[in-house]
C-alpha cells in the first residue's frame, strides 16, 4: 500500500473537491506500478493512496518479487511511485499550462491555478510504502476496507468544498450528503463512479494486428473507472487471487 507523503501540503491550491490532473496522475502511477512490479494482479487507487495485490503462486515457476524481502519491496515501490507520479503529473499538466500561458488574457483563477501546478511540478511529490501479507481469502476484505474509506473521503471532500469546517463539525457522511442536496442542490451520487469509490487497474486480453498474419492475443493493463461496490461483487477481486 502506497501513500502520498505530506500530500496535504503538496495538493494545496489544487481544484476542489476533485482535481482532474491529480486523479489522472494517481491512475497513471498505479498503472505504471502494475506493469512493472512482478506478480501484481490488481491495483486500486483512491485519494492519495494506491493498493497493489501481488501473488506468487500463479504457477510452480512463479517467484515472489524480491523474494518477499519486505524492506526492499517497500523502498523500491515507493521510489517507483515517486518517479512515476512526478512524471505523470508534469505530463498531465502540460496542456492546461500551455493553454493558460499562451492565452492573450486569462482569469485570475486560471493564473492562480497555473501557479499551483508549476509549484507542484517544481516541488515534486514523494510516496511512502507499506508491505504486508494477508491470506488470499482476506484480500477482498482489505479492498472493501479501502473502498469504504474512499467513499467517506469522497463525501467529506465534496462537503469541505462547499461548507466551512464549523458547519461540518461532527457531521457524519449521511448528514453531509443531506446538507449538500438540501442547501447546495448537489447530489453526491451524481459524481462519476471513480470519484465516489476509486478505480482499479486490471489486466485484459486484447487482439493486436487484427486481420493480419501477425494477429495475436496480448495482455494489457487498463484503468477501470466503473468498478463495482466490492461488498456486492466480491468476485471482481476473488477471481484474480483465488487461483
Q: Where are the regions that the model predicts?
A:
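Regulatory and interdomain segments flanking nucleotide-handling catalytic cores
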Residues: 1-243
